[in-house]
């Protein structure tokens, strides 16, 4: 398997629960390295731009409102098969359907407040990492 990078966002609900460290421990326990990270409070414009792919979807407005409701922890993860590994750690989008022991099963409250975001493919990962971390701010280790 190839070394990949993926974007992960710990959403406002999980940041408010003070579980960033527990989520980071899961990333590292799965062999993923944090190669860039920052705690930010997204502006409406940033959230709308980042989630523009969902603009026509009925949940877009609520998603943007949720993502600007509090700080988020954004990180680029690197490792063998990082995209699939991160998605496995996250669990199903709906925490009620997420497998026991996944981030969403353990820390999310609803399909809307579902604790984390993760890139779904190599192409989106490249775009999403570049959105938050220009190349000079990502460091392989």
Curated annotation (Swiss-Prot):
It comes from Methylibium petroleiphilum (strain ATCC BAA-1232 / LMG 22953 / PM1). Keywords: ATP-binding, Cytoplasm, Kinase, Magnesium, Metal-binding, Nucleotide metabolism, Nucleotide-binding, Phosphoprotein, Transferase. This is Nucleoside diphosphate kinase. ATP binds at residues 11, 59, 87, 93, 104, 114. It comes from the Bacteria. Its main location: cytoplasm. It is an enzyme of class 2 (transferase). It is found in: Cytoplasm. GO terms for cellular component: cytoplasm. Its cofactor is Mg(2+). The keyword Cytoplasm applies. Its EC number is 2.7.4.6. The keyword Zinc does not apply. SMART domains: NDK. It catalyses: a 2'-deoxyribonucleoside 5'-diphosphate + ATP = a 2'-deoxyribonucleoside 5'-triphosphate + ADP; a ribonucleoside 5'-diphosphate + ATP = a ribonucleoside 5'-triphosphate + ADP. Belongs to the NDK family. Transmembrane segments: none annotated. Homotetramer. The active site is at 117 (pros-phosphohistidine intermediate). PROSITE patterns: NDPK, NDPK_LIKE. Major role in the synthesis of nucleoside triphosphates other than ATP. The ATP gamma phosphate is transferred to the NDP beta phosphate via a ping-pong mechanism, using a phosphorylated active-site intermediate. One of its GO terms (molecular function) is metal ion binding.
């Amino acid at each position: 398997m190839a070394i990949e990078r993926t974007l992960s966002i710990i959403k406002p609900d999980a940041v408010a629960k003070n579980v960033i460290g527990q989520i980071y421990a899961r990333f590292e326990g799965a062999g993923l390295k944090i190669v860039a990270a920052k705690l930010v409070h997204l502006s409406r414009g940033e959230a709308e731009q980042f989630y523009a792919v969902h603009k026509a979807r009925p949940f877009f407005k609520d998603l943007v409102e949720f993502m600007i409701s509090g700080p988020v922890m954004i990180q680029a993860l690197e490792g063998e098969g990082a995209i699939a590994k991160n998605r496995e750690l996250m669990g199903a989008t709906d925490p009620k359907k997420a497998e026991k022991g996944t981030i969403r099963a353990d820390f999310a409250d609803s399909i809307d407040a579902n604790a984390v975001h993760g890139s779904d493919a190599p192409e989106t990962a490249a775009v999403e990492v570049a959105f938050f971390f220009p190349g000079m701010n990502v460091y392989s280790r």
